[in-house]
Amino acid sequence: MARKSKIERAKYPAKFKVRVRNRCKMCGRSRGYLRDFGLCRICFRFLANSGKIPGVVKASW
């Protein structure tokens, strides 16, 4: 419930531009955000493992 209200509040114009927080496009999580993909680490891993993000492969060395 608290996450939904934070997401709704994030849609309104902010008083200060510094307080803008990046959020995951899928789940709304604010921590572990990957800017290049617009996703949190959990959603990124899920989509990468299922092959939905083109060009992303598991690292092996």
From Swiss-Prot:
GO cellular component labels: cytoplasm; small ribosomal subunit
PANTHER family: 30S RIBOSOMAL PROTEIN S14, SMALL RIBOSOMAL SUBUNIT PROTEIN US14M
Superkingdom as given in the UniProt entry: Bacteria
Cofactor dependency: Zn(2+)
Source organism of this protein record: Thermodesulfovibrio yellowstonii (strain ATCC 51303 / DSM 11347 / YP87)
Keyword rRNA-binding applies: yes
Keyword rRNA-binding assigned: yes
Cofactor note: Binds 1 zinc ion per subunit.
UniProt cross-references to InterPro entries, sorted A to Z: Ribosomal_uS14 (IPR001209), Ribosomal_uS14_bact (IPR023053), Ribosomal_uS14_CS (IPR018271), Ribosomal_uS14_sf (IPR043140)
Quaternary structure, from the entry: Part of the 30S ribosomal subunit. Contacts proteins S3 and S10.
Disulfide bonds: none
Family, as annotated: Belongs to the universal ribosomal protein uS14 family. Zinc-binding uS14 subfamily.
Protein name: Small ribosomal subunit protein uS14
